[in-house]
């Protein structure tokens, strides 16, 4: 949500986070490990110019793009370096790429379940407007 009109730079950043999310979803859905999906998303963010802003502002950046959800809110596996296993069928994960700058933050967050044919979005996903102004 945006208070007032979202400046073009922020729309571009939001679209970048959508692209990162889609890349990570594709990797995980094809059986890649959480670690490889993290690397792919991080590398894409670097290419987009968000090196010092992905998941926080340098040096206070979280080193993950999402986490499993279960009995606890944040569970393993995590979309991060060192989680060298794929999501198994039935695994539920929140995928939440975001960038944070001095003048604001923007990102996406949806929850996905791993199935036989890839990941399925459990939250609003593409059926919800990418951003709303008021």
State where each predicted segment sits.
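Active-site neighborhoods and metal-handling regions in enzymes and metal-associated proteins
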Residues: 1-134
């Amino acid at each position: 949500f945006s208070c007032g009109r979202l400046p073009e730079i922020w729309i571009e950043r939001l679209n970048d986070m959508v692209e990162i999310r889609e890349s990570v979803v594709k990797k995980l859905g094809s059986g890649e490990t959480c670690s490889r999906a993290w690397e792919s998303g991080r590398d894409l963010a670097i290419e987009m110019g968000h090196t010092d802003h992905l998941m926080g502002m340098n040096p206070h950046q979280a080193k993950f793009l999402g986490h499993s959800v279960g009995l606890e809110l944040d569970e393993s596996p995590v979309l991060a370096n060192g989680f060298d296993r794929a999501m198994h069928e039935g695994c539920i994960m929140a995928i939440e790429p975001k960038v944070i700058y001095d003048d604001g933050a923007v990102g996406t967050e949806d929850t996905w379940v791993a199935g036989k044919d890839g990941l399925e979005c459990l939250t609003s996903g593409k059926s919800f407007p990418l951003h709303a102004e008021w």
